[in-house]
């Protein structure tokens, strides 16, 4: 895939992020939130590159999925698009999702799990050179330049047996993460504030 926006996209509704979460929960309750009906995608052995927003993006409909053996690189390097979907892999509600054996490099961010990374496992991935381009200005509170970012969840999230070689290996604004048997060459950043969502000047509480 080579896309000016997103390589693979698993949802279709465009509203404010908080309202999309509410709508998705209501649709799930109405239609039956069952593993047999929701998610369970397999995304395997793709070469996804030079996308200007994200490589693989999922929201609610990506639950119970397996993302494995993909080569994802050169994502958002021109920084022509911004927003909350900027990463090689960006998932909202990565419930019981396995992200394994992917090679992710030269992205503004490597893997970003956002909202409800419950039962998520990130294992056996190789991540390196995931940072903002040299010409880009780092804005206060800017969420870029790391291999893995786990945000607003209570877990459990397991991150194991990965090779993390970027300047920042892990950024956390969450709870319930276990980091086990990783090779880590970069720094850790723990964020305790600044993750509230403001849409059209109004505070949309995440919790």
Give residue spans per PLM region.
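Extracellular parallel beta-helix/beta-solenoid repeat domains
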Residues: 1-207
